């Protein structure tokens, strides 16, 4: 996968199309990423000893890698992420 934690990305598909954010977590096995401030979902939290106040919380859900593109910080344009192989050893 060519997207790493901390990369700036733009969402190119889905309900949050056009939004930008930085990658906070990468799931390599499922090819998904969590982007800061994007794809918010509401989760019903049960009260526990660690979190005595339950209720409905908002958190970011994972997005498939095919729905995001790397963002070039200098030009503010999206770029295609690809691996380059060199013939050097």
Curated annotation (Swiss-Prot):
Entry keyword Signal: no
Q: Which residues form the signal peptide?
A: none
- UniProt GO BP: translation
Output the superkingdom of the source species. Bacteria
| Gene3D superfamilies attached to this UniProt entry | 2.30.30.30
Q: Which Pfam families match?
A: KOW (PF00467), ribosomal_L24 (PF17136)
The residue stretches assigned to a coiled coil in this entry are none
InterPro entries per the UniProt record, alphabetical? KOW (IPR005824), Rib_uL2_dom2 (IPR014722), Ribosomal_uL24 (IPR003256), Ribosomal_uL24_CS (IPR005825), Ribosomal_uL24_KOW (IPR041988), Translation_prot_SH3-like_sf (IPR008991)
Q: Which GO terms describe its cellular component?
A: ribonucleoprotein complex; ribosome
* Presence of keyword Signal: no
What the entry lists under SUPFAM superfamilies is as follows:
Translation proteins SH3-like domain (SSF50104)
This protein's UniProt keywords: Ribonucleoprotein, Ribosomal protein, RNA-binding, rRNA-binding
GO MF entry, a single one: rRNA binding
Concerning SMART domains, the annotation shows: KOW
Its biological purpose: One of two assembly initiator proteins, it binds directly to the 5'-end of the 23S rRNA, where it nucleates assembly of the 50S subunit. One of the proteins that surrounds the polypeptide exit tunnel on the outside of the subunit.
Assembly description: Part of the 50S ribosomal subunit.
Family designation: Belongs to the universal ribosomal protein uL24 family.
Matching HAMAP family, A to Z?
A: Ribosomal_uL24_B
Q: What name appears for this protein in its UniProt entry? A: Large ribosomal subunit protein uL24
Can you name the source organism? Answer: Oenococcus oeni (strain ATCC BAA-331 / PSU-1)
Q: Which gene encodes it?
A: rplX
């Amino acid at each position: 996968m060519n997207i790493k934690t901390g990369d700036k990305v733009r969402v190119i598909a889905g309900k949050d199309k056009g939004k930008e954010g930085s990658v906070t977590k990468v799931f390599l096995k499922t090819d998904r990423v969590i982007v800061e401030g994007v794809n918010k979902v509401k989760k019903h939290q049960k009260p526990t000893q660690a979190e005595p106040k339950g209720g409905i919380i908002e958190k970011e859900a994972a997005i498939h890698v095919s729905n995001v593109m790397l963002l070039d910080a200098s030009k503010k344009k999206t770029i295609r992420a690809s691996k380059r192989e060199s013939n050097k050893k």
